[in-house]
């Protein structure tokens, strides 16, 4: 699995070759053996400025394959970090030989990142697929030009360059353990101190992962990452490296009175677990770094290294609400847990006590601990609980997705007349109507009762055209015909209206019901004023002029505009009205009968009876209007 082609070169031969190269004034390595070539290809990228091109060259881990000036520059950079005393475990600076032993492993590789392209550092094998091996980028390179190939074949390592401006960074790639654990890779990273903060470290780490996979490594392990090294920790956690463990007080660093903790990070290349991606979002690494710096500031009273003004101000503000108690970061009496593994462990322990639900476990955790996304962590833990899976199997619930408007049931109005316990007070009507007698034309009542006793109102599209049966001699024939024509036009306009959606259709239906109720109410008033009252007044005036023929006219033509069958309909209509209406009608009929019996009385007596009749009929007008309002209120009291 692991490509160990570099181990075929014996150490004696390697030392002999190094001795020969050191004794020659010109280091010409044109004839490089195939054992020193690598299957990895150079990787050219575009830096953040969008213009500068940089190339990372994979080189087999032999120091003699590098220019001497480049080795000296790398040694100076490494010793500079050693002198800082906050990243590497060395007390003293290293010599060139010690540096070679640390960085160059026989079974490993070294990556040199430089500006532009330097063909002398290209130790890759010539393959047919190398044109597509630039990680899918479309950056144009000079790798296939004649000049590049000539410089690669010549390989003059005595290059006079300013490596402090040309070299951007370096990392080594080697097995973490020998033999049976040689498939685990580790490495060391170093970025040019003059150009840090440009994203070069993250680019080197990403390339480290890609090349490790190509060389056959299955996992990566970094055993000693100091807690104060915030930069590398952000990069590792941002690339889904798992923090495997912590080694307390593992580093005695400069600027710290007490030893600091170190952390171990690891990542699987072939068996990536779900917990890394599901429980660690891009903001998680930022949160961890924030709490680590805050804890360091509270414990030591000193700002962490490489903190800008905004970071220092933020630490001062957070120090007022946070504290360290027995090595634990606290806020408002709760312990802050920013370690992902510890968060999962706490949620699992509380859940396993009684196998509680998400909300109860979240509440119990919130009593003692604090971290961002407690509910998400609890949800992930409960989803893995086998006992809860057996208790609550999938598919027991029903999930409804609202994709369109749900049609609602609506009640259609029915024209049944019911008694209202508390009828609404009748409104004031025109004074001209109060002084006139009222009688009901049976054709109008018949049409109304047919609507009352029928089925519920049909839909708009199936409305039956109404018909009116009027006597030819009725004084209200013309008015009713006009009313019927208006209603026919109104219904035809409704039928011709295009169908709307549910809500608009119900609004149109509501307006139709309101207009229909108001129309029926106006019909009662129009009939009372135009058809019945003039008829009665005309009869009364004729009776005064010719009292002899009045009996014969009343007996033969009691109501001229009604036929014989309408008397039965009139009686049925009277039975459905209120008792007070019946009493009023009986009183009117009694008064009329008295007038017929006393037709021989003098004119003064007849005038008094007529005034009494008109007064009673005025009361009937009020009662009928009140009942009409009650009927309208009943029809309008429909819920939608």
UniProtKB/Swiss-Prot annotation:
Q: Which GO terms describe its biological process?
A: DNA repair; negative regulation of autophagy; negative regulation of transcription by RNA polymerase II; rDNA heterochromatin formation; silent mating-type cassette heterochromatin formation; subtelomeric heterochromatin formation
According to the entry, every stretch annotated as the N-acetyltransferase domain falls at: 121-259
Q: Name one GO molecular function term.
A: acyltransferase activity, transferring groups other than amino-acyl groups
Compositionally biased residues, Basic and acidic residues: 549-565
Name the domain of life this protein comes from.
Answer: Eukaryota
Q: Which Gene3D superfamilies match?
A: 1.10.340.70, 3.40.630.30
Segments carrying the region annotation (Disordered) are 1-30, 534-565
Provide the Gene Ontology terms for cellular component: chromosome, telomeric region; nucleus
Null-mutant phenotype, please?
A: Decreases HTA1 RNA level.
Pfam families listed in its UniProt record: Acetyltransf_1, zf-H2C2
Q: Tell me the outcome of changing residue 388 to S.
A: Loss of complementation of the suppression phenotype
PANTHER family in UniProt: ACETYLTRANSFERASE, GNAT FAMILY, PROTEIN SPT10
**Any remaining note in the record?**
Present with 1500 molecules/cell in log phase SD medium.
Q: What is the role of this chain?
A: Required for normal transcription at a number of loci in yeast. Affects transcription at Ty1 elements, at PHO5, STE6 and ADH2.
Q: What is this protein called?
A: Protein SPT10
Please give the organism.
Answer: Saccharomyces cerevisiae (strain ATCC 204508 / S288c)
